[in-house]
């Protein structure tokens, strides 16, 4: 089977122990245009394939004259590398040159097992995912996409054409032979030279203009009336029955046993407002209770800081905490003279 383009032979590892079969395959191809690679070395990444090089990639059968071993080694990554090595319009063939996915004309093969059929079907799906297509003869072909071309999108074409038509129609009434008839102060129209075009005044390099009239493909206002798209009124989404339903508290907002109820972040069930109102009420009650305990500037109060029934025994009670014992009833009070009366005036200790 002689070929004119470059050919890549992919051999399973079992064929290396049968050199006579491998030599038979090599004799049918031009040696200077044929490359031979072992599938196991490709699968382990020991060798690489050049991109867009081969016109034909030929899968060889194993020692059992089937493609079972070849299909088992061709995983998705390896198939993609093989497809990338094909040139545009290149073909992927097998040794028997049979249509892919078919064992024979009746769909049966005496030498193939159930596992072989599954691998064959998997291989067929993978090569399609890799970008190959079937031609009229049932061969796998890499499509020639060709050079990609940028296609300009004409946005707001109808609106621009309408504005252009209106502009030309209005300018035809005023512009004649390159002049514009403008009314003078005495009521007589005087010709005024028309504005110079961009051909006479080219745009300086690096200067751009923004076209604010471009609607970027949005339909014009006149087309909105003819549009079949219906606008939804958000006020009609909920009726009175929906508004009157009881709000179901989410499980994460429910307090755990023995803990205070806390509102979650971005609370929408009303618990946050309820807790804030409760805290304000408690704060107002506490402030009101503190108001009754405040003393005026002219009011005096006598407070006995000593513990009832407890008397100091160290004799240093009036010297301060540094000299007092642990059980002293005057701990926390400043030093004082024995027998001096202690008074509180506006929360200041007066000795």
From Swiss-Prot:
<feature type="region of interest" description="Fe-S binding site B">
    <location>
        <begin position="314"/>
        <end position="328"/>
    </location>
</feature>
<keyword id="KW-0004">4Fe-4S</keyword>
<feature type="region of interest" description="Fe-S binding site A">
    <location>
        <begin position="253"/>
        <end position="269"/>
    </location>
</feature>
<dbReference type="InterPro" id="IPR007785">
    <property type="entry name" value="Anamorsin"/>
</dbReference>
<comment type="similarity">
    <text>Belongs to the anamorsin family.</text>
</comment>
<dbReference type="InterPro" id="IPR046408">
    <property type="entry name" value="CIAPIN1"/>
</dbReference>
<feature type="region of interest" description="N-terminal SAM-like domain">
    <location>
        <begin position="1"/>
        <end position="151"/>
    </location>
</feature>
<keyword id="KW-0479">Metal-binding</keyword>
<dbReference type="Pfam" id="PF16803">
    <property type="entry name" value="DRE2_N"/>
</dbReference>
<keyword id="KW-0496">Mitochondrion</keyword>
<protein>
    <recommendedName>
        <fullName>Fe-S cluster assembly protein DRE2</fullName>
    </recommendedName>
</protein>
<feature type="binding site">
    <location>
        <position position="269"/>
    </location>
    <ligand>
        <name>[2Fe-2S] cluster</name>
    </ligand>
</feature>
<dbReference type="GO" id="GO:0016226">
    <property type="term" value="P:iron-sulfur cluster assembly"/>
</dbReference>
<feature type="binding site">
    <location>
        <position position="317"/>
    </location>
    <ligand>
        <name>[4Fe-4S] cluster</name>
    </ligand>
</feature>
<feature type="binding site">
    <location>
        <position position="267"/>
    </location>
    <ligand>
        <name>[2Fe-2S] cluster</name>
    </ligand>
</feature>
<keyword id="KW-0963">Cytoplasm</keyword>
<dbReference type="GO" id="GO:0005758">
    <property type="term" value="C:mitochondrial intermembrane space"/>
</dbReference>
<dbReference type="GO" id="GO:0051537">
    <property type="term" value="F:2 iron, 2 sulfur cluster binding"/>
</dbReference>
<feature type="binding site">
    <location>
        <position position="325"/>
    </location>
    <ligand>
        <name>[4Fe-4S] cluster</name>
    </ligand>
</feature>
<feature type="compositionally biased region" description="Polar residues">
    <location>
        <begin position="105"/>
        <end position="114"/>
    </location>
</feature>
<dbReference type="InterPro" id="IPR031838">
    <property type="entry name" value="Dre2_N"/>
</dbReference>
<comment type="function">
    <text>Component of the cytosolic iron-sulfur (Fe-S) protein assembly (CIA) machinery required for the maturation of extramitochondrial Fe-S proteins. Part of an electron transfer chain functioning in an early step of cytosolic Fe-S biogenesis, facilitating the de novo assembly of a [4Fe-4S] cluster on the scaffold complex CFD1-NBP35. Electrons are transferred to DRE2 from NADPH via the FAD- and FMN-containing protein TAH18.</text>
</comment>
<dbReference type="GO" id="GO:0046872">
    <property type="term" value="F:metal ion binding"/>
</dbReference>
<dbReference type="GO" id="GO:0009055">
    <property type="term" value="F:electron transfer activity"/>
</dbReference>
<dbReference type="Pfam" id="PF05093">
    <property type="entry name" value="CIAPIN1"/>
</dbReference>
<feature type="short sequence motif" description="Cx2C motif 2">
    <location>
        <begin position="325"/>
        <end position="328"/>
    </location>
</feature>
<feature type="region of interest" description="Disordered">
    <location>
        <begin position="93"/>
        <end position="118"/>
    </location>
</feature>
<feature type="binding site">
    <location>
        <position position="253"/>
    </location>
    <ligand>
        <name>[2Fe-2S] cluster</name>
    </ligand>
</feature>
<keyword id="KW-0001">2Fe-2S</keyword>
<keyword id="KW-0411">Iron-sulfur</keyword>
<feature type="binding site">
    <location>
        <position position="328"/>
    </location>
    <ligand>
        <name>[4Fe-4S] cluster</name>
    </ligand>
</feature>
<feature type="short sequence motif" description="Cx2C motif 1">
    <location>
        <begin position="314"/>
        <end position="317"/>
    </location>
</feature>
<feature type="region of interest" description="Linker">
    <location>
        <begin position="152"/>
        <end position="243"/>
    </location>
</feature>
<comment type="subunit">
    <text>Monomer. Interacts with TAH18. Interacts with MIA40.</text>
</comment>
<keyword id="KW-0408">Iron</keyword>
<dbReference type="GO" id="GO:0051539">
    <property type="term" value="F:4 iron, 4 sulfur cluster binding"/>
</dbReference>
<feature type="binding site">
    <location>
        <position position="314"/>
    </location>
    <ligand>
        <name>[4Fe-4S] cluster</name>
    </ligand>
</feature>
<feature type="binding site">
    <location>
        <position position="264"/>
    </location>
    <ligand>
        <name>[2Fe-2S] cluster</name>
    </ligand>
</feature>
């Amino acid at each position: 089977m002689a070929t004119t383009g470059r050919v890549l032979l992919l051999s399973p590892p079992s064929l290396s122990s049968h050199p006579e079969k491998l030599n038979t395959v090599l004799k049918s191809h031009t040696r200077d245009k044929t490359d031979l690679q072992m599938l196991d070395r490709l699968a382990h990444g020991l060798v690489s394939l050049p991109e867009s090089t081969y016109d034909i990639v030929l899968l060889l059968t194993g020692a059992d004259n089937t493609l079972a071993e070849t299909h088992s080694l061709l995983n998705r990554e390896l198939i993609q590398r093989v497809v990338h090595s094909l040139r545009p319009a290149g073909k992927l063939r097998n040794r028997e040159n049979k249509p892919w996915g078919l064992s024979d004309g009746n769909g049966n093969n005496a030498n193939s097992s159930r596992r072989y059929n599954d691998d064959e079907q998997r291989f067929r799906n993978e090569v399609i995912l890799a970008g190959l297509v079937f031609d009229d003869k049932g061969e796998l072909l890499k499509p020639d996409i060709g050079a990609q071309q940028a296609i300009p999108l004409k946005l707001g074409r109808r609106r621009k054409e309408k504005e252009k038509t209106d502009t030309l129609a209005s300018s035809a009434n005023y512009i004649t032979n390159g002049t514009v008839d403008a009314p003078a102060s005495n009521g007589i129209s005087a010709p005024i030279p028309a504005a110079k075009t961009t051909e006479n005044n080219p745009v300086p390099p690096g200067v751009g203009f923004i076209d604010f009239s471009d609607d970027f493909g949005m339909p014009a206002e006149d087309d909105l009336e003819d549009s079949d798209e219906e606008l939804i009124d958000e006020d009609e989404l909920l009726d009175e029955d929906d508004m009157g339903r009881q709000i179901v508290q989410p499980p994460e907002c429910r307090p755990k046993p023995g803990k205070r109820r806390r509102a979650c972040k971005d609370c929408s069930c009303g618990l946050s407002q309820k807790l804030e109102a409760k805290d304000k009420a408690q704060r107002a009650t506490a402030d009101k209770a503190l108001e009754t305990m405040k003393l005026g500037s002219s009011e005096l109060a006598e407070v006995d800081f000593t513990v009832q029934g407890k008397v100091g025994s160290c004799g240093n009670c009036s010297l301060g905490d540094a000299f007092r014992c642990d059980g002293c009833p005057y701990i926390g009070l400043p030093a004082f003279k024995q027998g001096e009366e202690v008074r509180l005036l506006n929360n200041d200790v007066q000795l």
